[in-house]
Amino acid sequence: MSKELVFGHQNPDTDAIVAAKAFSYYENKMGADTEAVALGEPNEETQFVLDYFDEPALRVITKASDEVDSVMLVDHNEPQQSVSDIADVTVSHVVDHHRIAGFDTAQPLFYRAEPLGCCSTVIYKLFKENDIEIPAKLAGLMLSAIISDTLLLKSPTTTETDVAVVKDLAKIADIDYETYGLAMLKAGTNLDSKTEKELIDADAKSFEMAGKTVRVAQINTVDLDDVFKRQAALEAAAKDENASDGYDLFLILATNILDSNSELLVVGNPTEPVEKAFGKTIANNRLSLPGVVSRKKQVVPQLTDAFNA
């Protein structure tokens, strides 16, 4: 049996890191030979989680084909979000909770995707279905991933399953998930120590929409003014990436995790689909999006529909 690498998407968030750890553990218990790796360094929120549970960071890779022939993907499937040489390896497994786009394989594979708030919730179900015990430390990590993806169960992506899984994992990990969760989310909102490029790269994904490449970055904060006092510099950083990386449109979704409201900063063209998607007019390159916290559920589908209209 050949070794396989397990990894989440580029610019990994907490779920991308934890899901890789959890699914690798699960697969090894099922008899596979896997190693969890990452496509980037952990962000501040994820580092808080790793430190809290005394868990090492994953080894970071930029290529997979020089190590293995096959890989397992978690928390993503779109090739532009994956490892740079994804076309040169066989994808044997995918566990995800996102849309399927631009994904095809030459061989049959294991594919498990569910419309849940977090990939780690899907992986929890695999553990339960196969009677594999979740260790306390791993339960804490998986709990953290769900809190991160669902903004402490407040995001509209949250399902009843996510809520039930959080409560069960909290029991296994012996942790007060509400107190811990708020501290964890706040750990990821320290913006002053980061450059504008770091802010827009930390949690960003690319999407193909009607022939246009749209980059959507999300910045979590406890005060939107902390983001927009740097608007000019953020716009400049986004313009630089549009030019260097071939993005047509760069959207920066600044989200207040305390009151569940967002502001969208729009850099590039076309802007008409953005206005159509949200039924609003862009002013000073910005749109107010009250009640919007989820890129996956409240931004990308609306943009995709508007671009395809």
Curated annotation (Swiss-Prot):
Gene3D superfamilies: DHHA2 domain, inorganic pyrophosphatase (n-terminal core). It is an enzyme of class 3 (hydrolase). The keyword Lipoprotein does not apply. One of its GO terms (molecular function) is manganese ion binding. InterPro entries: DDH_dom, DHH_sf, DHHA2, DHHA2_dom_sf, Mn-dep_inorganic_PyrPase. Signal peptide: none annotated. PANTHER family: BNIP - RELATED, MANGANESE-DEPENDENT INORGANIC PYROPHOSPHATASE-RELATED. Belongs to the PPase class C family. This is Probable manganese-dependent inorganic pyrophosphatase. It comes from Lactiplantibacillus plantarum (strain ATCC BAA-793 / NCIMB 8826 / WCFS1) (Lactobacillus plantarum). The gene is ppaC.
